[in-house]
Amino acid sequence: MCIRDSPYTAMWTGSVTHALPGALLVWAIVAYRRPLIAGMMLGLAFGTIYYPLFLLPLWMSFYWRRGLVRFLSGAVTMVALLVVTLAITSVDAAAFVARLQQMFGIRFPIGEDVVGIWKYWNDVYRYPILAGFVFLSLAFAIWPAQKNLGTLMSGSAALMLGTQFWHAHSGGLALAWYLPLLLLTIFRPNLEDRIALSVLVGGGFRKNRQGKVVVRAA
């Protein structure tokens, strides 16, 4: 890989918060034909760092016509398991609430003790960038209208790259969050025909010409 011999590899390969989210997002892409598994991978990535939460509008739009319930079921189930794990491992209620807030990112953007590009720039400039990032995340729910696997990969890479511009800690340094998806986007073949309606594995329901509900074959 292009970062194999870089200082980033030596410093952060063993860091769970650097290496694991990107790996889980790649596995979510690999399992895109199985919405339940893809949702579980995305939910687990969200439990590691909360930034994959901003991928939900894009992924939900991809599965909108088929597979949405299975995708959300996988994501919600995995997040629920992680919350239960937090409850079991926390020493008291206050510690559980604090860890839960950290997991879901329920806090005002940090402006002190930052590490990375924002250590040298005025923190006030982060807020319009953050607002633009949230707008981009929500815009992926409706644009482009029909999403294929290529859209899923490129949109996910763009959003995870976008987090680097406002991430307070090591902002701009978490290459492993977006670089695997970016490489998949660059070297992908034509994926215009890989849409959820035609490639998903698993049963579903549809109506035939007589209006009867039948089970869709896998």
Segments from the language model and where they lie:
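Membrane-interface junctions at the ends of membrane-embedded or membrane-associated helices
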Residues: 32-40, 60-72, 186-218
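Primarily membrane-embedded glycan-assembly and transfer machineries that use lipid-linked glycans
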Residues: 4-36, 63-175, 179, 185-191
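Transmembrane helices and adjacent periplasmic/lumenal helix-loop junctions
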Residues: 40-61, 168-173
